[in-house]
From Swiss-Prot:
Gene Ontology cellular component annotations, sorted alphabetically: cytoplasm
Residue ranges crossing the lipid bilayer per the database entry: none
GO MF annotation terms: ethanolamine kinase activity
Database matches in PANTHER family: CHOLINE/ETHANOALAMINE KINASE, ETHANOLAMINE KINASE
The name this protein goes by in its record: Uncharacterized protein MG356
Lineage: Bacteria, Bacillati, Mycoplasmatota, Mycoplasmoidales, Mycoplasmoidaceae
Top-level taxon of the source organism: Bacteria
Signal peptide: none
Gene3D superfamilies: 3.90.1200.10, Phosphorylase Kinase, domain 1
InterPro entries in the cross-refs: Aminoglycoside_PTrfase, Kinase-like_dom_sf
One of the GO biological process terms: phosphatidylethanolamine biosynthetic process
Length: 280
């Protein structure tokens, strides 16, 4: 992404001129957005988000969710284009954690439970309700994994639904100097259930040992179902990579998803792994 586009966007929306900018740099090239850090000469700091045009997201859904979670995390956005997803938000000081300490996991759970406590039902007609079969008809998963996936989705039918961040990986949060977890980037957020939320963090970030700590800290979850949901989420992630633009980054991510699937199946569900190999 051309840095000049970020500069022009910032100047237009904040009504500043280029000479007001002290520093600007690209900090992230994600699957859906390009992100830039900018500091003005008056020391105010911002993050600029420019959306990829080849990935369509429901930005109205994101906008509503930002309003719903504002009492917990405030709303850092100073400009938000609900049509394009392009945005500018105040910079939140902090880092992404290098490892999941017990304190970090506790603070992460506290933040997740705030999201899960939100009364979303008044907005039920506007919010995205997670559909695990949204990509299923197009997937190239093997017949064995298709059957497994369908069986796993059925286990979630009767689980009470909550608002979920749905992508609370370490890239999508800030670990502040005050040792608090601020959740950011709600663009994939939707109504689902805490099992998916916790499983998605596990499949992206954690070893089985640390995953067990997270499950214990959250409390009230059936351990086996959480790890079954990890498999379910990994199979969903594989399907997601199939419908995204087939860039090198997406293809590499798919390989990583396959490695994580192998890791969890071999360690926790060896009989399923053996069946998968026989049917591959």
């Amino acid at each position: 992404m051309d840095l000049k586009k970020a500069v022009a966007f910032l100047c237009e929306k904040l009504q500043v001129v280029e000479t007001d900018i002290f520093k600007i740099e690209q900090i992230h090239s994600g699957f859906t957005n390009f992100s830039f850090f900018c500091e003005l000469k008056d020391h105010s700091k911002f993050q600029i988000r420019l959306s990829r045009k080849d990935v369509i997201l429901d930005r109205r859904n994101e906008q509503i969710i930002l309003q719903l979670v504002e009492p917990f995390f405030s709303n850092p956005f100073v400009y938000f284009d609900v049509t394009t997803g392009n945005a500018i938000k105040r910079w939140i000081e902090g880092t992404q954690p290098k490892r999941a300490t017990d304190l970090f996991l506790c603070r992460l759970v506290e933040s997740l439970k705030k999201v899960h406590s939100v009364d979303w039902k008044p907005f039920a007609n506007e919010l995205l309700i997670f559909d695990p079969l949204v990509y299923f008809e197009k997937t190239k998963l093997s017949a064995f994994y298709k059957r497994l996936y369908l069986n796993l989705t059925k286990k979630h039918i009767d689980i009470p639904k909550t608002l979920c961040h749905h992508d609370a990986t370490f890239d999508n949060l800030v670990w502040t100097p005050k040792k608090q977890v601020i959740l950011i980037d709600f663009e994939w957020s939707c109504v689902d259930n805490p099992y998916y939320e916790i499983a998605n963090i596990i499949r992206e970030e954690l070893t089985i040992e640390t995953a067990n700590k997270l499950i214990d800290i959250y409390g009230g979850l059936k351990r086996k179902l959480v790890f079954e949901t990890v498999i379910y989420v990994l199979l969903f992630a594989f399907q997601w990579t199939e419908i995204m633009p087939q860039t090198e980054a997406i293809l590499n991510y798919r390989k990583w998803v396959e490695k994580r699937l192998e890791y969890f199946l071999k360690a926790l569900f060896p009989s399923i792994w053996k069946q998968a190999q026989k049917n591959s």
